[in-house]
Amino acid sequence: MLTTTFRLLRAADACEGSYKLFRRAMRAKGYREDQPIPLYEALDSNGLADALWALRAVPSEQREERDRVARLLSCDYAERVLHRFEAVYPKDSRPRRCIETARRFADGQAAREELLAAYRAAAGAAGDAAGAPRAAAWAAGAAGDTVWAAGT
């Protein structure tokens, strides 16, 4: 389970308003200064944007898991718009394969070289779709961005 602390959030330069909201909610639940707080608490008290931001404020021993979670979230978000590309290019599977490769990479089942090849293929799909409806090109680009995020 990913956690953070008040100290880590401050060290990561948390937005003052969001930090105060989170701190007030967590103090009411009994959390103290350096006590680990599950990140799902940030989701409950502050919403998705702040919970995603709080991923940067996890202890160093949790960074590998944090990176995996961030990569898988990127895949989930890219899949949510993939239908826009596939509606215009139903036979072009490059963006879908890109997302699948990013998932496998996050789970340790794909090499970085595979990830780079998938990124290049999705970027090619986005380029090929440049003259198509904007939503299709954007969706293919999102798949490429997913792989980029998975590799960083």
Predicted regions and their residues:
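Short, glycine-biased loop/turn motifs at secondary-structure junctions and
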Residues: 1-152
